[in-house]
Amino acid sequence: MVIAMKKLDVTGDICPVPVLKTKKALEELNEGEELEVVGDYKPALENIKRFAENNGYTVVLAEETESRFRIVIKK
C-alpha cells in the first residue's frame, strides 16, 4: 500500500506561521495520509511536534540538521 504524502515547506517562516500552515495542511489530508514539513526555523520543530501530538496526530519522524528540520506527521 502506498501512503500519500503532502509536502509543506515553511522555510523563512517564524512562529506561529509554521504551526498555522501545518494545521491547515493537516486539515486537508485524508485519514492515513502523511504530511512532510521542512523548514529552517528550528524552534518550529518542537512547536509543530507538540501541536501534532496534542491534536491526535502521529509524529512518524522528527529530525534536524545544523540548519534545517524535517517532520513527518500522519493523520
Swiss-Prot record:
Any Pfam family: TusA
InterPro entries with a match to the protein in the record: TusA-like, TusA-like_sf
Source organism superkingdom: Archaea
Record-annotated active site: 15
Similarity comment text for this entry: Belongs to the sulfur carrier protein TusA family.
Protein name: Putative sulfur carrier protein MJ0990
